[in-house]
Design a protein with these regions (language model features):
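Aromatic/hydrophobic pocket-lining residues that form the small-molecule binding cavity
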Residues: 22, 52, 91, 123-126, ...
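Auxiliary Fe-S-binding modules of radical SAM enzymes
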Residues: 128-232
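Conserved SAM/AdoMet-binding glycine-rich loop
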Residues: 1-100
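Alpha-helical structural signal in soluble globular domains
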Residues: 24, 28-32, 58-62, 97, ...
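Short, hinge-like loop/turn segments at secondary-structure boundaries
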Residues: 58, 85-87, 124-126, 156-158, ...
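Conserved strand-turn element in the central/C-terminal portion of the radical SAM core barrel
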Residues: 46, 70, 74-78, 98-122, ...
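Catalytic cores of alpha/beta
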Residues: 54-56, 114-132
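Short beta-strand segments at enzyme active-site cores
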Residues: 4-10, 68, 105-109, 138-144, ...
Length: 232
């Protein structure tokens, strides 16, 4: 569609591309789509931190306005157990580096990633990152382990005990309650993996979202999305 106003770059971490090459791609896209307002892409910790501030600013000047970034968890214990390869401080540094270049961040947290034993640590430390950075969008999705990675996951996370949907609802509730952001955040929990779909703006809609989760606990299976209709 030549009238497209938003474009997402590929389905991989394009920030790993040499900056000069990526800028050429961005310029080509702008010529092909003259009404373009936003270009977005995935970004990993390593590739963002490997860019200089000047490089990120040049990318922003060429309409790379938004980076999708997986926080997953703010707990260093959990990050180590899942072999994320980064620390919570590096996650904060990554977000700050993007936002300091006026590139917006859409971040994700994975509910249930710490299992039952690390649930509270997972939530408190994840909320700490949100409260100490300036992301624009926040999404939560629910952990789903494909058969191809299950064995590897449990081998590195030997004390993992899976959370039920009700555990996840409680985790989501506490996470929302703990969020006191610097700026308004557009919040979505509408990924296909989620037992309950939510949307709102934080902190304005915090109470409304908490109440929706309380209702879902009372109504149970009447409102929880059946597993057969979910995707991970």
């Amino acid at each position: 569609n030549p009238d497209a106003t938003k474009i997402f770059l590929a389905d991989g971490d394009v920030l790993g591309i040499k900056t000069s090459v990526l800028i050429d791609i961005l310029k080509y896209i702008q010529k092909a789509f003259p009404k373009l307002r936003r270009i977005s892409a995935y970004g990993s910790t390593q590739n963002v931190l490997n860019k200089t501030n000047e490089e990120l600013e040049h990318l922003k000047e060429n309409k790379l306005n938004l980076v999708y970034y997986g926080i997953e968890s703010g707990s260093d214990t959990i990050l180590e157990k899942i072999n994320k390869g980064v620390s919570s401080q590096e996650i904060i540094d990554t977000i700050n580096k993007l936002t300091n270049s006026n590139i917006k961040v859409s971040a994700t947290i994975i509910l249930g990633l710490g299992g039952i034993a690390y649930s509270r640590e997972h939530i408190l430390h994840s909320a700490r990152i949100i409260n100490n950075t300036q992301i624009t969008y926040l999404s939560t999705l629910q952990l789903g382990l494909d058969d191809s990675i299950k064995d590897r996951f449990f081998k590195s996370f030997i004390d993992y005990f899976a959370s039920t949907d009700y555990d996840i609802i409680n985790e989501q509730r506490e996470f929302i309650e703990q969020i006191n952001p610097i700026n308004n955040i557009i919040f979505r929990s509408n990924h296909a993996s989620n037992a309950i779909h939510l949307s709102g703006t934080l902190p304005k809609d915090k109470q409304k979202l908490v109440e929706q989760l309380d209702v879902s606990k009372i109504m149970g299976e009447e409102i929880i999305i059946p597993m057969k209709y979910r995707g991970f």
